[in-house]
Structures are given as C-alpha cells and as structure tokens.
Swiss-Prot record:
Belongs to the thioester dehydratase family. FabZ subfamily. Its EC number is 4.2.1.59. The gene is fabZ. This is 3-hydroxyacyl-[acyl-carrier-protein] dehydratase FabZ. The keyword RNA-binding does not apply. It catalyses: a (3R)-hydroxyacyl-[ACP] = a (2E)-enoyl-[ACP] + H2O. It is found in: Cytoplasm. PANTHER family: 3-HYDROXYACYL-[ACYL-CARRIER-PROTEIN] DEHYDRATASE. Signal peptide: none annotated. It comes from Azorhizobium caulinodans (strain ATCC 43989 / DSM 5975 / JCM 20966 / LMG 6465 / NBRC 14845 / NCIMB 13405 / ORS 571). The keyword Heme does not apply. Involved in unsaturated fatty acids biosynthesis. Catalyzes the dehydration of short chain beta-hydroxyacyl-ACPs and long chain saturated and unsaturated beta-hydroxyacyl-ACPs. It comes from the Bacteria. Keywords: Cytoplasm, Lipid A biosynthesis, Lipid biosynthesis, Lipid metabolism, Lyase. The lineage of its organism: Bacteria, Pseudomonadati, Pseudomonadota, Alphaproteobacteria, Hyphomicrobiales. One of its GO terms (cellular component) is cytoplasm.
Length: 158
C-alpha cells in the first residue's frame, strides 16, 4: 500500500452547521435553502441538507391544499450548498461573499418534494476557473433522486 493510499484512507471530511453557513453566505430566511453541510471534501464535493417544513412561505401558493416545493428553490439549494463549500474551502473567517448564479443546465425534476421531506444536495465539482465554479448536483429524498442539474456560479470578492 502506497503512502498516498494511506493518506486517502485517513482523510477526515469536514462539516458545517447553520451558524457557519450564515457566516459564509449572504442568504437569509426565507431564501436560505440549506441547513447543514457534511462530507465536505474541500471544494470538490459535499452533501447539503434542507429540512423542508410546512411553515415555508412558498407553500401558501404552491399549491394550496397540495404543497409542493418549487423546483427552482431546489436548484437554488444546490447552488447555495456549492457556494458555501467554495467559500469555506478558501478558509479564514470572512463576511459573507456575494455568490452570483451563472448557469443552470440539464435540470430535471423527477418527483415532488413536500413538507416533512429532508432534501440532500449531493454536489460534485466539475470545473473551476479563477473565481468561477461548476458543479453537478443531485437532490435526493430518502435516497431517491428528486432533481438534478449542473450549476455554475461566480464568487465576487468585495
């Protein structure tokens, strides 16, 4: 077994809670779509979590008596998760950076997400160039893929 293989086997993956997410991202309720992030491997991959509750304002009109989380908010949750790990990977405590959504490609929605579901955002980096990142994301509920997309974002330094 090589030294490189041994190092990979002992790699400790990072996690961040809601307080750290709030320190990293400028988003706030009702537009913050991620509650915690685990299995963070630098800016390469992670799993973000969103506890979907009936109290969220979009359920009042989407749809009355049949609450379904809007697909665009699921994609937004993917992007916020990816943005948070990009900023987190840069290190240091810093004020929230502005993260601008650049692209959404190959978005697919497979089944409705409802109050009571726990969304998992599985994000994997596809590419990075200067202050821009591209990720492939899968949103899952109970292990089942409910949405997927490729997202790109730019972090604007202040």
């Amino acid at each position: 077994m090589s030294e490189e293989t041994k190092a990979d086997e002992t790699k400790v993956l990072d996690s961040i809670d809601i307080l750290r997410i709030l320190a990293l991202l400028p988003h706030r309720y009702p537009f913050l779509m991620v509650d915690r992030i685990e299995a963070i491997d630098s800016d390469l991959s992670c799993v973000g979590y969103k506890n979907v509750t009936a109290n969220e304002p979009h359920f009042q009109g989407h749809f009355p008596n049949n609450p379904v989380m809007p697909g665009v908010l699921i994609i937004e949750g993917m992007a916020q998760t990816a943005g948070a790990i990009c900023i987190h990977a840069k290190g240091a405590d810093r004020k929230p950076s502005l993260v601008y959504f650049m692209t959404i490609d190959e978005a697919k929605f497979r089944r409705p997400v409802r109050p009571g579901d726990v969304l998992e955002y599985h994000m994997t980096r596809l590419n990075k160039r200067r202050n821009m990142w591209w990720y492939r994301g899968e949103a899952r509920v109970g292990g089942e893929i409910v949405a997927e997309a490729r997202v790109g974002a730019m972090i604007a330094e202040e």
